[in-house]
Amino acid sequence: MEDIIVLFNRVTEKLEKELAIRIFVLAHQLERDKAIRLLQGLFWRYRFKKPRVDYCLCWWCCKFYYWQLQSTLSITTA
């Protein structure tokens, strides 16, 4: 799991917040090797894009953002 987190952090530093959260959810749903291939492909695709400094999108921050999104959705649908 550690290699996925490191790769995820390197990829998401160049993405928008919504896309990073979607990839976070997808990484939990896919098998480990498929998630790694997806992240490697995205890393290659965005290799020349400048990192975003607006906000942190590391694994743990995306986990927090996803938790916030889930709690907001459960409150509004209740």
UniProtKB/Swiss-Prot annotation:
Signal peptide extent: none
Key words, A-Z: Host nucleus, Virion
Motif (Nuclear export signal): 35-43
Entry GO terms, CC: host cell nucleus; virion component
Compartment list: Virion; Host nucleus
Domain of life where this protein originates: Viruses
Chain location of the short sequence motif Nuclear localization signal per the record: 45-54
Primary role: Seems to function as a Vpr-like protein, since it mediates host cell cycle arrest in G2 phase. Cell cycle arrest creates a favorable environment for maximizing viral expression and production.
The name this protein goes by in its record: Probable Vpr-like protein
Organism: Feline immunodeficiency virus (isolate Petaluma)
